[in-house]
Each structure stands twice: as structure tokens, then as C-alpha cells.
Amino acid sequence: MRVSKLKLPLEALFENANFILTAVSPYYEYREGEKTEHLLGYKYEVVEDGNFERFSVKVPSIKPIITAEMLEKSSSRIFVTFEDAFGRIYQTPVGSLEISFSAVSAKLLEA
């Protein structure tokens, strides 16, 4: 069994499935190590509401749930949750293990 094939549900890793949104940015397709102009989706940088663990979740969507400008202008915390979110373990070029997260969709929560 390969560790990279494991899918870890987000709910199994974090007590609370609601996260504080800190940033939104697009992510693009790469071909042969080169970034293309083909938009694959948006990356949501979040912080866990309990122990303040920081991580990002990629969502394959051509439209973000909130723009970076709207997030920046907000005077209060913005909370999000993710549908069918999971993490995958991968090894970096220097040999350390990391987890990348992705989800089917993201949803804004009422404050």
C-alpha cells in the first residue's frame, strides 16, 4: 500500500469542520513544470477555529465563494466549511512528509 494513495477525511483530522478564511487565490494547471493560463480552481487558506492550525484547501471551481478584495474589506471573521474534503500525504523533494487538502466545494457560513 502506498501512503500517497491514502485519503484522509478532513473531519477525521479536525474536531470542528468550520474554519476561519484568511486568503483566497487562484491555482493553475502546470505542464512539464511550467505554469499555464488554464485556471483549475481556487485555493482557500484557512485557520482552524480551535487550535489555530493553518492550511489551505484547493477547490476546483471557476468562481470563488468570495473574492480576495471582499475578504480584505471585511471587518469581521469569515467562516467557511468544505464539502467532501480530504487530505493526501506526499513527500517533498527534501524528503519530509506534508499533507495537501482538496474538496469538492467550499461554502460561506453565517457569522
Tell where the protein language model's regions lie, with residue ranges.
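OB-fold and OB-like single-stranded nucleic-acid-recognition modules
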Residues: 1-111
